[in-house]
């Protein structure tokens, strides 16, 4: 299988503070990769470097023709604006030259009905708004989806629907999925690869069930993780 992404010796700094240094990994086309690590380990900085929103050193090589959809953890958008979900999507559609058919397709892919899309964005639940952001990312017909902590602020039923939607999309659209998560249960469920970032660099990279040992997690997070590892595997 060919690689969709190859990263070699990536570095990111904010002023004199290094956030990432010497980061190297590759992601096969169609793979699902999770990025885990404590706050401040550079997970979001990595995503922003991958989409060109942060300057970086080293090399980021996407396969030719790669189109990226990015779903942020949160969006700086006033939720009390008199703006419907449909209007929100149309604003993006104008930027990427997407058609009304593309908007309809994106809503269908995330199972968000037109009745919901016509409502003001401030009235949407956390799960509905997250699926709206996912539809927003899908308007450009991406081959890669970057998802920053997909379940932040969502209740359990909303989480399950979002998981199912993303898994189905990844299969049907043959997307390469790269997501950030603090939930090891989600990592085990959805990821074929995991990249562990700690405050002192990369602590592991590979299939989660092979590399997420208590020792690796303790090095990554700086504290024992036996409880979380057990919870991730289930009772």
Language-model features and meaning:
Residues 100-116:
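Conserved ABC ATPase "signature" region
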Residues 181-182:
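H-loop/switch region of ABC-family ATPase nucleotide-binding domains
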Residues 160-172:
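Helical segment within the ABC ATPase nucleotide-binding domain
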Residues 145-148:
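Catalytic Walker B motif of ABC-type/P-loop ATPase nucleotide-binding domains
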């Amino acid at each position: 299988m060919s690689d969709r992404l190859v990263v070699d010796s990536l570095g990111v700094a904010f002023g004199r503070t290094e956030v990432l240094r010497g980061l190297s990994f590759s992601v096969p086309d169609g793979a699902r990769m999770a990025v885990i690590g404590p706050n401040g380990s550079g997970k979001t900085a990595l995503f922003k470097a991958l989409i060109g929103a942060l300057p970086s050193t080293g090399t980021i090589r996407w396969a030719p023709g790669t189109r990226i959809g990015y779903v942020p953890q949160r969006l700086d958008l006033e939720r009390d604006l008199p703006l419907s979900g449909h209007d929100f999507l149309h604003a993006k559609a104008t930027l990427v030259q997407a058609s009304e058919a593309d908007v309809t397709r994106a809503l269908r892919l995330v199972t968000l009905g037109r009745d919901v899309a016509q409502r003001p964005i401030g009235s949407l639940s956390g799960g509905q708004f997250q699926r709206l952001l996912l539809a927003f990312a899908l308007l450009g017909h991406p081959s890669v989806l970057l998802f920053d902590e997909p379940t932040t602020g969502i209740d359990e039923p909303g989480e399950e629907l979002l998981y199912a939607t993303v898994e189905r999309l990844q299969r049907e659209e043959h997307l390469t999925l790269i997501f950030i998560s603090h939930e090891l249960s989600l990592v085990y469920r959805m990821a074929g690869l995991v990249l562990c970032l700690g405050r002192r660099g990369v602590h592991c990279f590979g299939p989660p069930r092979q590399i997420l040992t208590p020792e690796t997690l303790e090095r990554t997070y700086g504290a024992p993780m036996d409880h979380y590892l057990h919870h991730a595997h289930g009772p």
